[in-house]
Amino acid sequence: MIYLSGLLGFLFMLTAEAGVGNSSAMPFCSETEQCLMFDLICESDEYEVRHYDSVKWVSTTERSIFMEMAAMKAFKRLYKYIDGGNEKGKKIEMTAPVLIKMVDKKFWQKSEYTMSFLLPAEDQENPPTPTDSNVKFVNKADFHSFKTFKTYLDLCSRISVFGFRSKKDFFVLQLDSINAKYSKGFHFGAGYNSPMTMFKRHNEVWFVAEGEPVCPDEWE
């Protein structure tokens, strides 16, 4: 089981197509055989700018006050789909990352959380239809990303969720400081590790870009 956990990074999303490839090409994506691939555009000591192509995901949405409660329900629903809960009864390979879309909100407000599993390469063209009407296919456009250092926050706990959100807010300030253009009101978290993984976790936060992302050498 892949779950969001420990993350510090942020990405810009644009428009274009994503490759699903062998995880051996990505040292930090080592718990599944296939991962979402990317091209490194530029980097600094703190950030990487990446490009991803578009790819097909299987997604579901859950509404809750707490992200961790919504994520748990959404994960179980999606896992049931890849474990045979589809019209073919087919078991589908787990991939990474697991993606979750989070809408900005006040702590006490309910919000929609949309979780997505990346479909493996062999199921990109014609995946089996879900038997649960709450599970849908989504084609996400290609995107560029900013990637920064990581921490080991556990998003399964409420305290760590607070920490994660504070880091997200910090990166928003960083984006604004370089006059980056991005869509407001939501962001994405990408998780690469099982909840059983205690060390060397790797997770990221994504923001959707509007226009070309700014490379580190353009910040000076």
PLM segments and residue spans:
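A solvent-exposed interaction/effector surface
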Residues: I2-E220
